[in-house]
């Protein structure tokens, strides 16, 4: 094979492949790229793999996380050294990393022709030392939302930053939503309307706001239920639901390897996060034509739910966006008392209005699928492949 026709070699780097948004993106990226490129995934640990990696080349560096500042520092250099050796052995053209620890290790490697790093959370870009490190040592820094890329360019003056939306397997989601064998859907099999939210037990998800807003929705519309799908015990949230008098209307469903049959049977998606990068769950809801009410947090909801994201982001009141309803951002202080805050009332009012307005509800249902296509894996692949080709001419 002539050199001009040689398949380029791509190394994807992720800390692990367990439950997590960027790990899922890493695996999906590998499957998309392997059609045109030789792809290898390097991970620091192969423990607790949650994704299908059959048919993919995965190398376990066996350098999992360690406790203590000294051990963590040593780990950074051990990982970078091992990755550099591997890049040289495999003659890697482009290394592309996901997550903070992988980005740091990748930035410090010297074995690939080009280096790409990816930021997937708003909290990540607030770390100035980290951002300076990866920007100075990367050929391109991807941010998963336009708002994040905008902030990085403005706050740090970096010019090698590009927005690259997370890929969503639209057809796969729709197909999986029809595979309900073995799933317990009894909570959904009533005449009640089911409101749903997804996310692990983490303060950044703002689930106390969700429960209090739902209490108000249920007061107005007693035929409503709430399901929270995600990993965690949710002990303090179950206690809050008891104090709010809604425990019999709320299901903490736990982690679901296939959450899509549950989304498919739901009536409304709610998001109450304090911050996001680009919330994949909103795109997944759109893919299943599920109407959305989301707080207008940094970042992601505004640009998912409205064409002119800058216009939507600037709104300080309830806003009926192109593809869903945005409500004011919630307060970051964790308040586990039963008193209601203004933003919770606004979220509850918007959700109640949408559920009670068949014309508005149907308009969002019809618009959802076309918007989800903008976040398809095909769109992601085209943009990523274009970047790789540009950098490796």
Predicted regions and their residues:
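Carbohydrate-associated surface elements
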Residues: 147, 167
């Amino acid at each position: 094979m002539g050199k001009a026709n040689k398949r380029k070699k791509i190394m994807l780097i992720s800390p692990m492949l367990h439950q997590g948004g960027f790990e899922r993106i890493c695996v999906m990226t590998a499957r998309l790229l392997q059609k045109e490129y030789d792809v290898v995934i390097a991970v620091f640990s192969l423990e607790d793999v949650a994704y299908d990696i059959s048919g993919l080349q995965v190398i376990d560096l066996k350098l999992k996380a360690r406790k203590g500042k000294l051990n963590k520092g040593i780990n950074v250099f051990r990982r970078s050294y091992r990755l550099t050796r591997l890049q040289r052995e495999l003659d890697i053209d482009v290394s592309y990393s996901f997550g903070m620890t992988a980005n740091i290790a990748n930035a410090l490697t010297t074995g690939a022709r080009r280096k790409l790093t990816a930021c997937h959370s708003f909290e990540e870009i607030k770390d100035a030392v980290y951002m300076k490190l990866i920007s100075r040592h990367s050929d391109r820094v991807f941010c998963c939302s336009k708002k994040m890329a905008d902030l990085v360019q403005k706050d740090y003056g970096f010019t090698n930053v590009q927005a690259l939306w997370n890929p969503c397997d639209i057809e796969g989601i729709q197909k999986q939503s029809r595979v309900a064998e073995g799933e317990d859907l009894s909570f959904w099999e009533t005449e009640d309307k089911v409101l749903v939210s997804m996310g692990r037990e983490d303060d950044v998800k703002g689930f106390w706001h969700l429960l209090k807003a739902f209490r108000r929705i249920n007061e107005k519309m007693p035929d409503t239920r709430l399901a929270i799908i995600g990993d965690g015990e949710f002990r303090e949230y179950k206690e809050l639901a008891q104090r709010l008098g809604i425990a019999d209307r709320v299901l903490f469903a736990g982690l679901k390897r296939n959450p899509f049959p549950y989304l498919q049977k739901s009536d409304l998606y709610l998001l109450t996060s304090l911050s996001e990068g680009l919330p994949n769950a909103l795109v997944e809801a759109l893919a299943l034509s599920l109407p959305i009410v989301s707080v207008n947090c940094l970042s992601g909801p505004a640009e998912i739910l409205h064409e002119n994201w800058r216009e939507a982001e600037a709104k300080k009141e309830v806003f009926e966006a192109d593809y869903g309803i945005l409500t004011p951002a919630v307060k970051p202080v964790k308040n586990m008392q039963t008193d209601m805050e203004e933003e919770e009332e606004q979220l509850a009012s918007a959700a109640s209005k949408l559920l009670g307005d068949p014309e508005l509800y149907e308009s969002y249902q019809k618009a959802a699928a076309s918007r989800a296509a903008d976040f398809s894996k095909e769109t992601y692949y085209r943009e990523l492949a274009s970047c790789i080709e540009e950098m490796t001419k």
